[in-house]
């Protein structure tokens, strides 16, 4: 995470350019592998991370652009949650970390969105790429899932692109750090290429290095001797000399 001033400045510029209405920015929920308690490794929505910095699931940011009120909505940990995860910061503590003044429950978020819609206010939101989030937005906005993305805010899309296209010194430092890790990964790949001689083993080595560095791949690694096949998944067939 960056300093909370960074997130405050990003949100301030966002609301300044949108001028009026309500901004709805949902984070992501866990995605189960084969049952609810066995989720895939969590990856937060990038736009939510950009404006909130919180890499935990089930949070939503709502900003009343006209009044400037920012509220982080999300669940408090139950006893069952604490048994699995240990004590974690409260919702209010998380909001404070990123400079958000108010925090409330998901139920109150639904009421706030419904009140905005009833008052015929513009609700700005981004297009959704996750089916579960499409359904959530469908229920919130009272439109069919097929029409949710049709109502996405073009002004919000343009503003997010405008902001995220310009990198601060802190962001550039993070990009350079990632490039340094990429260099290490390619050097390791060349070092082990003849010794391992199959894509699965090489992918495992590289994924281990990424995880040990506190990172993970944005998409599955493409390691193949058949460059004519796009997005070929690693297999254990030996490379031909």
What is each PLM-predicted segment?
Residues 4, 165, 192-196, 232-235:
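Hydrophobic alpha-helical scaffolding
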Residues 98-99, 200-208, 232-236:
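Alpha-helix boundary/capping detector
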Residues 117, 166, 194-195, 217, ...:
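Hydrophobic beta-strand core residues of beta-sandwich domains
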Residues 161, 187-191, 228:
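A broad detector of the eukaryotic-type serine/threonine protein kinase catalytic domain
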Residues 216-229:
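Short, basic/aromatic beta-hairpin or loop at an interaction surface
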């Amino acid at each position: 995470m960056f300093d909370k001033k960074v997130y405050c400045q990003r949100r301030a510029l966002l609301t300044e350019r949108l001028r009026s209405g309500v901004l709805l920015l949902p984070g992501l929920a866990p995605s189960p592998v084969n049952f609810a308690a066995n989720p895939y490794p969590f990856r937060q929505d990038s736009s939510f991370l950009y404006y909130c910095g919180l890499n935990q699931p089930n949070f939503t940011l709502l900003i009343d652009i006209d009044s400037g009120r920012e509220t982080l909505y999300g669940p408090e940990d139950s006893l069952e949650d604490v048994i699995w995860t240990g004590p974690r910061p409260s919702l209010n503590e998380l909001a404070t970390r990123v400079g958000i003044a108010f925090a409330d429950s998901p139920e109150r978020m639904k009421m706030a969105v419904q009140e905005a819609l009833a008052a015929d206010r513009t609700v700005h939101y981004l297009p959704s790429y996750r089916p579960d989030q499409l359904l959530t937005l469908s229920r919130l906005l009272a439109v069919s899932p097929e029409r949710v993305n049709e109502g996405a805010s073009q002004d919000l899309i343009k503003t997010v692109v405008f902001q995220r296209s310009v990198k601060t010194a802190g962001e550039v430092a993070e990009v350079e750090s990632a490039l340094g890790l990429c260099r290490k990964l390619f050097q390791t790949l060349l070092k082990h290429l003849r010794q391992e001689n199959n894509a699965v083993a090489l992918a495992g080595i590289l994924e281990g290095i990424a995880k040990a560095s506190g990172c993970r791949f944005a998409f599955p690694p493409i390691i193949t001797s058949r460059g004519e096949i796009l997005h070929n998944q690693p297999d254990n067939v030996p490379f031909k000399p």
